[in-house]
A protein has these predicted regions:
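Long, acidic, intrinsically disordered low-complexity segments
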Residues: 1, 5-10, 38, 51-56
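Amphipathic alpha-helical linker/stalk segments
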Residues: 1-28
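Interdomain hinge/linker segments and adjacent boundary elements that couple functional modules
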Residues: 9, 22, 26, 41, ...
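A short, mixed-charge helix-start or loop-turn motif at secondary-structure junctions
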Residues: 14-19, 62, 123-127
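Short, solvent-exposed segments of well-ordered alpha helices
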Residues: 19-23, 67, 129
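C-terminal peripheral helix-coil segments that are non-catalytic and often amphipathic
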Residues: 27-45, 74-97, 101-150
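Short, solvent-exposed amphipathic helices
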Residues: 68-72
Length: 150
């Protein structure tokens, strides 16, 4: 549990608080995306251990998968669902589709083996800059299609 408390900061659960308009909604979405892009690509301990467990559970769920889902995953998914509902209303299918699209793009970063990095990272671009660009790209796809409705 302590290991995953690093990967599920308490303030993630408070992202929806204070969202009242398009600008604050975009800030919350961006923070969600940037936070999880950072979590799944972390290179220092103890975060790297949490990222490795997350990678394993995403690709080959084990017996602890359900416990992780109940303890952490459901809360984090609820934050994203709440943020998406602010733009999509009560359309549960659209919320699931958008949630899946966002998560799949973040989760793809977990499984990129170092030997494949050259296929995804532009030559001469540092890790932090690349991660910022990836986060920007994910957010721009959301902001180009969805708008805060309350």
């Amino acid at each position: 549990r302590r290991l995953f408390s690093f990967a599920t900061a308490d303030d993630m659960m408070r992202l929806c608080e204070g969202v009242k308009d398009q600008q604050s909604w975009q800030v919350a979405i961006r923070r969600f995306v940037e936070t999880f892009v950072g979590y799944v690509t972390v290179t220092s301990k103890p975060g790297v251990y949490a990222a490795q467990i997350f990678r394993w559970e995403v690709t080959c769920p084990s017996t602890i998968s359900r416990e992780l889902q109940l303890a952490y995953g459901n809360k984090v998914y609820e934050v994203l669902r709440t943020l998406l509902t602010m733009a999509l209303g009560d359309d549960a299918d659209a919320v699931k589709i958008w949630g899946g699209a966002i998560w799949s793009r973040i989760a793809a970063l977990i499984v990129i083996d170092k030997s494949w990095v050259s296929h995804f990272v532009p030559r001469g671009v540092g890790r932090d800059e690349w991660l910022r660009r990836v986060s920007d790209n994910i957010c721009e796809s959301v902001f180009g299609s969805l708008h805060y409705r309350g």
